[in-house]
């Protein structure tokens, strides 16, 4: 008992000490990192071993596939059925899935969907920018809300927006001030929730400067939902994401069950967030523990229950729904079945929502991603992309220790979102170069250059923010699975932030071709990384950046 108490007290001690260090970001980062390590027994057990080829054996076992009578997919349709043991499984026709390719297409689709929304608009993002394009989006919302009130038969249109508190409150003009007019004009229809991480509290919250407080933890989910249609993306609601910041986007059209799930998920996170008021103050939901003034353990426990209730109830609901569907279908005549098929095509594509909220002890995305990497067999190809190359130790070990081929796409320094930034932030691209070089050196030292290849995205006048993966089974020229959403595969995504993405599994060749073309378009703008890459003058990393990077890499 005493040992457990001492272990639990360790992180508290370091964080209290951290709070006494104003103006010393380097030392503060060091102590914060020590605090994290003291509290992460699981991660310590995963530290790199020289026996890298044993990585598949050391990784989590694939969850056992069960075959309840209510399962959506008959055995053998696809090998990823085990995911349904963790999350709800949504079967859809591939004709309802469209892959978008550009920021402009993303922006125009959002505006168009807002204009025709009748029942609900739900938007979750890190922040809303303050420029003219963002104002155009707000104006679309205002116009649609106005029409809903003036219609002959007024609709019950509701708008729910979830943003991060720290990022959305930065500066005098910010996400909050952009949304206040909507909130004041339509108080019964508009809800704005601002998530505040429970780990930013006390002296730490008072002393960390505005821009740096975001490193402690964020609301990072990106979901844009209009009635029964959903866009899943990694893009934020900001002008660059509408013009020249490359990301990924998938549009799920008329998928009511998926839209219901993400509405409930955003509502759940919204309920444990601070509620923006018309006077620009914030309030906690009645009966909810305050995220940074209340007891942290109690708050996290309540948040875990709220989110897991959504996941588990949706999973049960889907099982029951599909059990009824299959039972009904078995009683239909051939003509009835054909007629039913005209109304709702048989599913050839399966959607799995993967949620990662480590502050609330929810690690579904981490489990699924590690299992996918573990199970990728010899001859399979994994195309993995991230705008910020900073893989967790577990992901790195799996890439280096398993048998599939990997092509990893990352941002060249010039298209990194921090390139040219003022102050300390301007050194972040160099820190990523340092991390990239260390990983490349390890690949070479293990003789894995043929199996694991790094590629850098470059496009004049653009930045790069795409993340996710495409999985090609051995012998296949098209992907059967993709992960798309907000996670970056880095420490922050796994441990600090709230994340959501979806796994799309499809046997439809046309949709597989869409995903393949998406992958090809991104990789075509890249160059292969070699030893010569790091000899270029632009890749020289200053000594102080090399020294600081290990101390701060868990914060970005």
From Swiss-Prot:
CDD domains membership: PLDc_PGS1_euk_1, PLDc_PGS1_euk_2
Protein name (Swiss-Prot/TrEMBL): CDP-diacylglycerol--glycerol-3-phosphate 3-phosphatidyltransferase, mitochondrial
Presence of keyword Nucleus: no
Main localization (coarse): mitochondrion
A GO term, aspect molecular function: ATP binding
Transit peptide, UniProt annotation: 1-28
Keywords carried by this UniProt record: ATP-binding, Lipid biosynthesis, Lipid metabolism, Mitochondrion, Nucleotide-binding, Phospholipid biosynthesis, Phospholipid metabolism, Phosphoprotein, Repeat, Transferase, Transit peptide
Enzyme category, top tier: transferase
UniProt keyword Signal, yes or no: no
Source organism of the structure: Homo sapiens
Xref: InterPro entries: PGS1 (IPR016270), PLipase_D/transphosphatidylase (IPR001736)
Modified residues (Phosphoserine): 49
Binding positions (ATP): 124-131
Location(s), subcellular: Mitochondrion
EC number: 2.7.8.5
Function (record text): Functions in the biosynthesis of the anionic phospholipids phosphatidylglycerol and cardiolipin.
Enzymatic reactions: a CDP-1,2-diacyl-sn-glycerol + sn-glycerol 3-phosphate = a 1,2-diacyl-sn-glycero-3-phospho-(1'-sn-glycero-3'-phosphate) + CMP + H(+)
The PLD phosphodiesterase domain, residue ranges: 215-241, 460-493
Pathway(s): Phospholipid metabolism; phosphatidylglycerol biosynthesis; phosphatidylglycerol from CDP-diacylglycerol: step 1/2
Family the UniProt entry places it in: Belongs to the CDP-alcohol phosphatidyltransferase class-II family.
Biological process (GO), any one: cardiolipin biosynthetic process
Activity regulation annotation text: Activated by calcium and magnesium and inhibited by other bivalent cations.
Active site residues per record: 220, 222, 227
PANTHER family (alphabetical): CDP-DIACYLGLYCEROL--GLYCEROL-3-PHOSPHATE 3-PHOSPHATIDYLTRANSFERASE, MITOCHONDRIAL, CDP-DIACYLGLYCEROL--SERINE O-PHOSPHATIDYLTRANSFERASE
